[in-house]
Protein backbone atom coordinates (compact mmCIF):
# COMPACT_ATOMS: atom_id res chain seq x y z
CA UNK A 1 0.00 0.00 0.00
CA UNK A 2 1.41 3.39 -1.04
CA UNK A 3 2.36 5.76 1.75
CA UNK A 4 0.26 8.96 1.88
CA UNK A 5 2.15 12.06 2.92
CA UNK A 6 1.02 13.48 6.23
CA UNK A 7 0.55 16.96 4.79
CA UNK A 8 -1.94 15.59 2.27
CA UNK A 9 -4.01 13.97 5.03
CA UNK A 10 -3.94 17.23 6.95
CA UNK A 11 -4.94 19.24 3.87
CA UNK A 12 -7.91 16.96 3.12
CA UNK A 13 -9.07 17.19 6.75
CA UNK A 14 -8.78 20.98 6.80
CA UNK A 15 -10.73 21.27 3.56
CA UNK A 16 -13.35 18.87 4.92
CA UNK A 17 -13.76 20.96 8.08
CA UNK A 18 -14.08 24.16 6.05
CA UNK A 19 -16.72 22.61 3.80
CA UNK A 20 -18.77 21.66 6.85
CA UNK A 21 -18.19 25.00 8.56
CA UNK A 22 -19.75 27.29 5.94
CA UNK A 23 -23.25 27.68 4.53
CA UNK A 24 -22.00 28.07 0.94
CA UNK A 25 -19.12 26.29 -0.81
CA UNK A 26 -18.06 27.36 -4.28
CA UNK A 27 -15.74 25.73 -6.80
CA UNK A 28 -13.75 28.22 -8.89
CA UNK A 29 -11.15 28.30 -11.64
CA UNK A 30 -8.20 30.61 -10.94
CA UNK A 31 -6.29 29.88 -14.14
CA UNK A 32 -4.52 32.83 -15.78
CA UNK A 33 -5.33 35.26 -12.95
CA UNK A 34 -2.44 37.65 -12.24
CA UNK A 35 -1.12 37.34 -8.68
CA UNK A 36 -1.84 41.01 -7.97
CA UNK A 37 -5.50 40.70 -9.00
CA UNK A 38 -5.94 37.51 -6.95
CA UNK A 39 -4.43 39.20 -3.91
CA UNK A 40 -6.75 42.18 -4.37
CA UNK A 41 -9.74 39.85 -4.59
CA UNK A 42 -8.69 38.06 -1.40
CA UNK A 43 -8.59 41.43 0.37
CA UNK A 44 -12.01 42.39 -0.98
CA UNK A 45 -13.55 39.15 0.28
CA UNK A 46 -11.47 38.97 3.46
CA UNK A 47 -14.38 39.64 5.84
CA UNK A 48 -16.99 37.62 3.96
CA UNK A 49 -15.31 34.71 2.16
CA UNK A 50 -12.24 32.48 2.20
CA UNK A 51 -10.45 31.37 -0.98
CA UNK A 52 -8.48 28.14 -0.63
CA UNK A 53 -6.36 26.76 -3.49
CA UNK A 54 -5.33 23.10 -3.49
CA UNK A 55 -4.64 20.12 -5.73
CA UNK A 56 -7.54 18.63 -7.68
CA UNK A 57 -7.15 15.21 -6.09
CA UNK A 58 -7.13 16.63 -2.57
CA UNK A 59 -10.19 18.79 -3.25
CA UNK A 60 -12.00 15.75 -4.67
CA UNK A 61 -11.12 13.67 -1.59
CA UNK A 62 -12.30 16.41 0.76
CA UNK A 63 -15.59 16.81 -1.12
CA UNK A 64 -16.08 13.05 -1.17
CA UNK A 65 -15.50 12.86 2.57
CA UNK A 66 -17.85 15.78 3.26
CA UNK A 67 -20.42 14.20 0.96
CA UNK A 68 -20.99 11.45 3.51
CA UNK A 69 -22.51 14.09 5.79
CA UNK A 70 -23.66 16.83 3.39
CA UNK A 71 -25.90 15.51 0.64
CA UNK A 72 -24.81 16.37 -2.91
CA UNK A 73 -21.78 18.49 -1.94
CA UNK A 74 -19.41 15.98 -3.56
CA UNK A 75 -20.96 16.77 -6.97
CA UNK A 76 -18.93 20.01 -6.95
CA UNK A 77 -16.05 17.84 -8.18
CA UNK A 78 -17.78 17.67 -11.55
CA UNK A 79 -17.13 21.39 -12.08
CA UNK A 80 -13.39 21.43 -11.38
CA UNK A 81 -11.26 22.77 -14.23
CA UNK A 82 -8.09 24.74 -14.76
CA UNK A 83 -6.54 25.77 -11.45
CA UNK A 84 -9.28 24.82 -8.97
CA UNK A 85 -9.98 26.54 -5.68
CA UNK A 86 -12.71 26.31 -3.07
CA UNK A 87 -14.50 29.43 -1.85
CA UNK A 88 -16.12 29.30 1.57
CA UNK A 89 -18.71 31.87 2.63
CA UNK A 90 -22.00 32.42 4.43
CA UNK A 91 -23.26 34.97 1.91
CA UNK A 92 -25.91 34.25 -0.69
CA UNK A 93 -24.33 32.36 -3.65
CA UNK A 94 -25.92 34.79 -6.12
CA UNK A 95 -24.36 37.72 -4.30
CA UNK A 96 -20.98 35.96 -4.27
CA UNK A 97 -21.23 35.30 -8.00
CA UNK A 98 -22.06 38.95 -8.73
CA UNK A 99 -19.12 40.21 -6.63
CA UNK A 100 -16.73 37.91 -8.48
CA UNK A 101 -18.13 38.81 -11.91
CA UNK A 102 -17.94 42.55 -11.17
CA UNK A 103 -14.29 42.17 -10.19
CA UNK A 104 -13.26 40.76 -13.57
CA UNK A 105 -11.12 42.96 -15.83
CA UNK A 106 -10.66 43.02 -19.64
CA UNK A 107 -7.72 41.03 -21.02
CA UNK A 108 -6.06 40.70 -24.45
CA UNK A 109 -6.93 37.82 -26.77
CA UNK A 110 -4.81 34.69 -26.44
CA UNK A 111 -4.33 32.14 -29.25
CA UNK A 112 -6.41 29.06 -28.49
CA UNK A 113 -8.56 30.78 -25.85
CA UNK A 114 -12.32 30.27 -26.07
CA UNK A 115 -14.29 33.41 -26.91
CA UNK A 116 -16.86 34.03 -24.13
CA UNK A 117 -18.95 36.15 -26.52
CA UNK A 118 -18.89 37.13 -30.18
CA UNK A 119 -15.69 39.12 -30.81
CA UNK A 120 -16.50 42.12 -32.97
CA UNK A 121 -14.16 44.49 -34.78
CA UNK A 122 -16.21 47.71 -34.83
CA UNK A 123 -16.82 49.95 -37.79
CA UNK A 124 -14.61 53.02 -38.01
CA UNK A 125 -11.07 54.37 -38.12
CA UNK A 126 -8.41 51.90 -36.99
CA UNK A 127 -5.84 54.62 -36.42
CA UNK A 128 -3.40 52.91 -38.80
CA UNK A 129 -1.89 54.54 -41.87
CA UNK A 130 -1.94 52.55 -45.14
CA UNK A 131 0.47 49.62 -44.96
CA UNK A 132 0.81 45.84 -44.68
CA UNK A 133 -1.77 45.70 -41.88
CA UNK A 134 -4.47 46.41 -44.47
CA UNK A 135 -3.79 43.04 -46.10
CA UNK A 136 -3.64 41.33 -42.70
CA UNK A 137 -7.05 42.70 -41.78
CA UNK A 138 -8.56 41.64 -45.08
CA UNK A 139 -6.94 38.21 -44.80
CA UNK A 140 -8.99 37.37 -41.70
CA UNK A 141 -12.17 38.69 -43.29
CA UNK A 142 -12.32 42.20 -41.87
CA UNK A 143 -13.82 44.63 -44.45
CA UNK A 144 -10.99 47.18 -44.30
CA UNK A 145 -10.15 49.89 -46.81
CA UNK A 146 -8.19 53.13 -47.14
CA UNK A 147 -10.17 56.30 -46.64
CA UNK A 148 -8.74 59.82 -46.27
CA UNK A 149 -5.27 58.47 -45.63
CA UNK A 150 -6.36 56.04 -42.90
CA UNK A 151 -7.32 52.38 -42.74
CA UNK A 152 -10.98 52.12 -41.80
CA UNK A 153 -13.34 49.20 -41.19
CA UNK A 154 -16.46 49.53 -43.37
CA UNK A 155 -18.86 47.86 -40.95
CA UNK A 156 -18.94 45.84 -37.73
CA UNK A 157 -17.47 42.39 -38.32
CA UNK A 158 -17.52 39.27 -36.10
CA UNK A 159 -14.08 37.67 -36.27
CA UNK A 160 -14.72 34.91 -33.70
CA UNK A 161 -18.09 33.60 -32.59
CA UNK A 162 -18.88 32.80 -28.96
CA UNK A 163 -17.55 29.38 -27.94
CA UNK A 164 -14.95 29.19 -30.72
CA UNK A 165 -11.17 29.20 -30.32
CA UNK A 166 -9.30 32.40 -31.10
CA UNK A 167 -6.87 31.74 -34.01
CA UNK A 168 -3.29 33.05 -33.57
CA UNK A 169 -3.59 35.54 -36.46
CA UNK A 170 -6.86 36.93 -35.09
CA UNK A 171 -5.37 37.24 -31.61
CA UNK A 172 -2.47 39.26 -33.02
CA UNK A 173 -4.74 41.62 -34.96
CA UNK A 174 -7.04 42.14 -31.96
CA UNK A 175 -4.05 43.06 -29.80
CA UNK A 176 -2.83 45.58 -32.39
CA UNK A 177 -6.33 47.07 -32.56
CA UNK A 178 -6.38 47.28 -28.75
CA UNK A 179 -9.47 45.08 -28.53
CA UNK A 180 -9.56 43.07 -25.29
CA UNK A 181 -12.26 40.41 -25.70
CA UNK A 182 -11.40 38.25 -22.71
CA UNK A 183 -11.99 38.73 -18.99
CA UNK A 184 -9.63 37.84 -16.19
CA UNK A 185 -10.90 37.08 -12.72
CA UNK A 186 -12.12 34.38 -10.38
CA UNK A 187 -14.39 32.15 -12.44
CA UNK A 188 -17.01 30.64 -10.12
CA UNK A 189 -18.14 27.45 -11.82
CA UNK A 190 -20.69 26.25 -9.24
CA UNK A 191 -21.81 26.86 -5.67
CA UNK A 192 -23.36 24.54 -3.08
CA UNK A 193 -26.01 25.61 -0.57
CA UNK A 194 -28.58 23.55 1.35
CA UNK A 195 -28.09 20.34 -0.66
CA UNK A 196 -28.38 22.22 -3.95
CA UNK A 197 -25.65 22.95 -6.49
CA UNK A 198 -26.09 26.14 -8.51
CA UNK A 199 -24.11 26.26 -11.75
CA UNK A 200 -22.75 29.45 -13.29
CA UNK A 201 -25.58 29.74 -15.81
CA UNK A 202 -28.14 29.63 -12.98
CA UNK A 203 -26.20 32.16 -10.91
CA UNK A 204 -26.10 34.58 -13.84
CA UNK A 205 -29.02 36.96 -13.36
CA UNK A 206 -30.18 39.82 -15.56
CA UNK A 207 -30.89 42.30 -12.77
CA UNK A 208 -32.91 44.73 -14.88
CA UNK A 209 -35.14 41.98 -16.29
CA UNK A 210 -35.56 40.36 -12.87
CA UNK A 211 -36.55 43.69 -11.30
CA UNK A 212 -38.96 44.36 -14.18
CA UNK A 213 -40.54 40.90 -13.78
CA UNK A 214 -40.97 41.42 -10.03
CA UNK A 215 -42.56 44.84 -10.54
CA UNK A 216 -44.91 43.42 -13.18
CA UNK A 217 -45.89 40.48 -10.96
CA UNK A 218 -46.53 42.82 -8.02
CA UNK A 219 -48.70 45.09 -10.18
CA UNK A 220 -50.75 42.16 -11.48
CA UNK A 221 -51.14 40.66 -8.01
CA UNK A 222 -52.15 44.07 -6.65
CA UNK A 223 -54.83 44.53 -9.34
CA UNK A 224 -56.19 41.04 -8.76
CA UNK A 225 -56.26 41.56 -4.99
CA UNK A 226 -58.07 44.91 -5.28
CA UNK A 227 -60.68 43.63 -7.74
CA UNK A 228 -61.22 40.40 -5.77
CA UNK A 229 -61.45 42.47 -2.56
CA UNK A 230 -58.63 40.60 -0.84
CA UNK A 231 -57.46 42.69 2.09
CA UNK A 232 -53.73 43.17 2.50
CA UNK A 233 -51.57 45.96 3.88
CA UNK A 234 -50.87 47.16 0.34
CA UNK A 235 -54.42 46.93 -1.06
CA UNK A 236 -56.49 48.25 1.86
CA UNK A 237 -56.18 51.96 0.87
CA UNK A 238 -57.13 51.22 -2.76
CA UNK A 239 -60.06 48.97 -1.78
CA UNK A 240 -61.40 51.58 0.66
CA UNK A 241 -61.00 54.34 -1.92
CA UNK A 242 -62.80 52.22 -4.52
CA UNK A 243 -65.66 51.47 -2.09
CA UNK A 244 -65.93 55.14 -1.14
CA UNK A 245 -66.11 56.15 -4.80
CA UNK A 246 -68.86 53.62 -5.53
CA UNK A 247 -70.78 54.65 -2.41
CA UNK A 248 -70.59 58.31 -3.39
CA UNK A 249 -71.84 57.60 -6.93
CA UNK A 250 -74.71 55.51 -5.57
CA UNK A 251 -75.70 58.16 -3.01
CA UNK A 252 -75.53 60.94 -5.57
CA UNK A 253 -77.59 59.17 -8.23
CA UNK A 254 -80.13 57.92 -5.67
CA UNK A 255 -80.38 61.44 -4.15
CA UNK A 256 -79.34 60.23 -0.70
CA UNK A 257 -78.30 63.16 1.49
CA UNK A 258 -74.93 62.77 3.21
CA UNK A 259 -72.25 65.21 4.29
CA UNK A 260 -70.46 64.53 0.99
CA UNK A 261 -73.45 64.66 -1.38
CA UNK A 262 -75.70 67.37 0.12
CA UNK A 263 -74.01 70.33 -1.58
CA UNK A 264 -73.94 68.60 -4.95
CA UNK A 265 -77.55 67.41 -4.67
CA UNK A 266 -78.73 70.92 -3.72
CA UNK A 267 -76.82 72.34 -6.69
CA UNK A 268 -78.36 69.68 -8.90
CA UNK A 269 -81.88 70.44 -7.60
CA UNK A 270 -81.32 74.15 -8.08
CA UNK A 271 -80.19 73.60 -11.67
CA UNK A 272 -83.23 71.40 -12.31
CA UNK A 273 -85.49 74.07 -10.85
CA UNK A 274 -84.03 76.71 -13.16
CA UNK A 275 -84.38 74.39 -16.16
CA UNK A 276 -88.03 73.75 -15.28
CA UNK A 277 -88.64 77.48 -14.84
CA UNK A 278 -87.04 78.22 -18.20
CA UNK A 279 -89.24 75.62 -19.90
CA UNK A 280 -92.35 77.03 -18.23
CA UNK A 281 -91.41 80.59 -19.23
CA UNK A 282 -91.17 79.54 -22.87
CA UNK A 283 -94.77 78.30 -22.74
CA UNK A 284 -96.18 81.08 -20.60
CA UNK A 285 -94.07 84.05 -19.60
CA UNK A 286 -96.45 84.89 -16.74
CA UNK A 287 -95.90 81.47 -15.16
CA UNK A 288 -92.52 82.67 -13.85
CA UNK A 289 -92.23 85.52 -11.33
CA UNK A 290 -89.73 88.37 -11.60
CA UNK A 291 -87.29 86.80 -9.12
CA UNK A 292 -87.04 83.63 -11.19
CA UNK A 293 -86.75 85.63 -14.40
CA UNK A 294 -83.80 87.50 -12.87
CA UNK A 295 -82.13 84.23 -11.86
CA UNK A 296 -82.69 82.78 -15.34
CA UNK A 297 -81.16 85.78 -17.03
CA UNK A 298 -78.09 85.82 -14.79
CA UNK A 299 -77.38 82.13 -14.43
CA UNK A 300 -74.10 80.87 -15.80
CA UNK A 301 -74.08 78.30 -18.57
CA UNK A 302 -74.23 74.85 -17.00
CA UNK A 303 -74.98 71.25 -18.19
CA UNK A 304 -78.52 70.08 -17.82
CA UNK A 305 -79.30 67.87 -14.78
CA UNK A 306 -79.90 64.88 -17.03
CA UNK A 307 -76.42 65.38 -18.51
CA UNK A 308 -74.88 65.50 -15.03
CA UNK A 309 -76.56 62.25 -14.08
CA UNK A 310 -75.44 60.68 -17.32
CA UNK A 311 -71.86 61.83 -16.68
CA UNK A 312 -71.82 60.27 -13.22
CA UNK A 313 -73.34 57.07 -14.57
CA UNK A 314 -70.89 56.99 -17.48
CA UNK A 315 -67.94 57.46 -15.11
CA UNK A 316 -69.21 54.60 -12.97
CA UNK A 317 -69.60 52.37 -16.04
CA UNK A 318 -66.11 53.25 -17.27
CA UNK A 319 -64.69 52.49 -13.82
CA UNK A 320 -66.44 49.10 -13.82
CA UNK A 321 -65.02 48.28 -17.26
CA UNK A 322 -61.48 49.25 -16.18
CA UNK A 323 -61.77 47.12 -13.04
CA UNK A 324 -62.96 44.13 -15.06
CA UNK A 325 -60.04 44.54 -17.47
CA UNK A 326 -57.53 44.78 -14.59
CA UNK A 327 -59.01 41.71 -12.92
CA UNK A 328 -58.85 39.75 -16.18
CA UNK A 329 -55.25 40.80 -16.69
CA UNK A 330 -54.35 39.72 -13.18
CA UNK A 331 -56.07 36.36 -13.51
CA UNK A 332 -54.54 35.74 -16.91
CA UNK A 333 -51.05 36.45 -15.63
CA UNK A 334 -51.40 34.23 -12.58
CA UNK A 335 -53.17 31.30 -14.18
CA UNK A 336 -51.82 31.49 -17.76
From Swiss-Prot:
Example of a GO MF term: structural constituent of ribosome
GO cellular component, one term: cytosolic large ribosomal subunit
Compositionally biased residues, Acidic residues: 307-327
Disordered, as annotated region: 292-336
Domain of life: Archaea
InterPro entries named among the record's database cross-references: Ribosomal_protein_uL10, Ribosomal_uL10, Ribosomal_uL10-like_insert, Ribosomal_uL10-like_insert_sf, Ribosomal_uL10-like_sf, Ribosomal_uL10_arc
A Pfam family assignment: RL10P_insert
Keywords: Ribonucleoprotein, Ribosomal protein, RNA-binding, rRNA-binding
One GO-annotated biological process of the protein: ribosomal large subunit assembly
Oligomer status and interactors: Part of the 50S ribosomal subunit. Forms part of the ribosomal stalk which helps the ribosome interact with GTP-bound translation factors. Forms a heptameric L10(L12)2(L12)2(L12)2 complex, where L10 forms an elongated spine to which the L12 dimers bind in a sequential fashion.
Function: Forms part of the ribosomal stalk, playing a central role in the interaction of the ribosome with GTP-bound translation factors.
Family: Belongs to the universal ribosomal protein uL10 family.
Protein name listed in UniProt: Large ribosomal subunit protein uL10
Organism: Methanothermobacter thermautotrophicus (strain ATCC 29096 / DSM 1053 / JCM 10044 / NBRC 100330 / Delta H) (Methanobacterium thermoautotrophicum)
Gene for this chain: rpl10
